[in-house]
Amino acid sequence: MASMQHFSLAALLLAASICLGDADRTECQLPLDKGTPCTQEGGVKPSVAWWHDDKSGICLSFKYTGCGGNANRFTTIKNCEQHCKMPDRGACALGKKPAEDSNGEQLVCAGMREDKCPNGYQCKMMAFMGLCCPTKEEELFAREYEGVCKSGKPVKMDRGSGWMMTILGKSCDDQFCPEDAKCERGKLFANCCK
């Protein structure tokens, strides 16, 4: 009985931390705002910054023009991820709903045991459990997140959070690619190609 009380208390604390954690992260839901060019002499020069795209659930790069903008702007991808991506939260790619049982409850799966998921769904592990997510969207998101260059050239990588990662943005209009790379638009994201 005591272990059940401990489990209930832990679940309550986790739920509270998730709810309270989201309450002070409203800036992460703001749309991209590139700001405006600074007109004052000695103003901030344009630079690459990151914003949290609430729809995709990831941090994307863009060219910040130097002045103004909103609070959904971070100087590094690491800062963006630490502030906006809850490590104990998870969701299916592109905001798609996980599979549900006949009672409307989300189907829970474990690891690579996709036999627990209906056809067209795959097990996606979250922090504490797995959900059955639509396979088509999960595969598209994974492919796009790694970056694809239609030109056949390699994707430009950067040491963003301490490891090599693809430089991604929402659109080539966001002008986030370094000078030695060309932006190419994919189905979901834009990435930099060598």
Curated annotation (Swiss-Prot):
One GO term describing the cellular component: extracellular region
Disulfide bonds: C28-C84, C38-C67, C59-C80
Presence of keyword Signal: yes
Domain called WR1: residue spans: 90-134
Chain segments annotated as coiled-coil in the UniProt record: none
Tree of life domain: Eukaryota
BPTI/Kunitz inhibitor domain segment(s): 28-84
Keywords: Allergen, Disulfide bond, Protease inhibitor, Secreted, Serine protease inhibitor, Signal
Major localization class: secreted
GO MF term set: serine-type endopeptidase inhibitor activity
SUPFAM superfamilies (alphabetical): BPTI-like
The keyword Signal is annotated on this UniProt entry: yes
Compartments where found: Secreted
Short name of one Pfam family: Kunitz_BPTI
Protein name according to UniProt: Major allergen Ani s 1
Organism: Anisakis simplex (Herring worm)
